[in-house]
């Protein structure tokens, strides 16, 4: 089995695209351990690890949580994550169009529920949706627009490159959610959605790594620390 390492992190950093809204690259961000208690069952996970929000159950759980006061940092996080989850969906849809691979087809459906879960929070706090009527591949945030364009270009080179892009998207997602999660000040509704988004990204990262293994490729983490990556893959 061969090891493929593409220095995409360098390309993303050089383009100013990795975690720009959070003030830097992924270095220094350590993922919190997965929540070990029994949170509300608002996600469904199938045998392949595809992780989708059950939006009806999520609505019920959100309705039971008192509405708090949202800070500017929390609002920024929701706006960014709404579009970043859309980015994952749109990238996977485009890469599935190019390569007709079930991993993209299945995870793109899950990602659609992820961005809708964040939309429920935007609506709950009366925050204007940055997605609006934007088409696939179109983003209000210029950082995410540039990242989408770059990731699709990288994933267009080959199926292996496309699967590596998928794994990188999930790495970036995990780091961004963890960063925004540290800004949440007592709003349990936001914490619940973010923690479940992280569960989804962990599962989807594992799915892309398995798909690469079937192509005889050993994926090396591009953004997560080796310890965080190993904990996810071995759990």
Task: Locate predicted features.
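C-terminal motif of bacterial Sec signal peptides marking the signal peptidase cleavage site
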Residues: 17-21
């Amino acid at each position: 089995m061969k090891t493929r390492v593409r220095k995409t992190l360098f390309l993303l950093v050089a383009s100013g695209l990795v975690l720009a809204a959070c003030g830097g690259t992924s270095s220094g961000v350590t993922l919190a351990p997965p929540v070990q208690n029994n949170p509300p069952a608002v996600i469904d996970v199938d045998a392949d690890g595809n992780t989708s929000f059950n939006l009806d159950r999520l609505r019920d759980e959100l309705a039971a949580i008192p509405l708090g006061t949202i800070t500017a940092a929390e609002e920024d996080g929701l706006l960014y994550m709404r579009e970043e989850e859309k980015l994952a969906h749109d990238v996977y849809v485009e890469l599935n169009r190019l390569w007709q691979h079930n991993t993209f087809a299945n995870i793109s459906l899950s990602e659609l529920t992820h961005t809708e879960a964040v939309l429920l929070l935007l609506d709950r706090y009366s925050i204007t949706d940055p997605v609006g009527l934007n088409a696939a591949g179109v983003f209000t945030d210029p950082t995410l627009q540039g990242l989408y364009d770059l990731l699709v270009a990288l994933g267009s080179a080959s199926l292996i490159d496309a699967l590596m892009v998928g794994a990188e998207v999930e790495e970036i997602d995990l780091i961004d959610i963890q960063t925004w999660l540290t800004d949440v000040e007592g709003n349990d509704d936001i914490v619940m959605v973010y923690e479940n988004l992280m569960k989804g990204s962990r599962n989807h990262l594992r799915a892309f790594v398995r798909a690469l293994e079937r192509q005889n490729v050993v994926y090396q983490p591009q953004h997560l620390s080796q310890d965080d990556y190993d904990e996810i893959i071995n759990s």
